[in-house]
């Protein structure tokens, strides 16, 4: 599985340029159908806007963009260039423009749409898709907080807790961190605790 960058989160950004209002959204998607559904969602939300321009880039190589009535090459392509330059995939970006009555010109539009896409990406952040181990660990209650901190310290995250005689934790850990985590767990538990890997998943990691 090859690592690649995706948006860390969905995000929104907004700015005004010569009385035109630009509202940009970035979403993490996994398919063209999902990307187009997000585009349709934003077009319905901002149905009264002059333009809802968009682009998306998928890990499978699919690349699409639309200018939605803006002069050709002044909206979707500059937006797309932002994500290709940043090497971000599995992303869809929609930029809504409410026209303010002042023409921006081709150069002004190109800069504005590129800025809108970059602002939304900066708000979303980036994460690297990477292999994660899904682990199970039975933890005595007095050790719970220490184990929680240990997981977080190794860039892991807890998926669920099952409270019984002890706490059974289901958590995710980057594969490259599992050996260090296991060694630290053995040390703090005096060799009494070990985590069991149940599967591996390919998921976004920490924000970069």
Model-identified regions with their sequence ranges:
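Short amphipathic alpha-helix segments
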Residues: 138-156
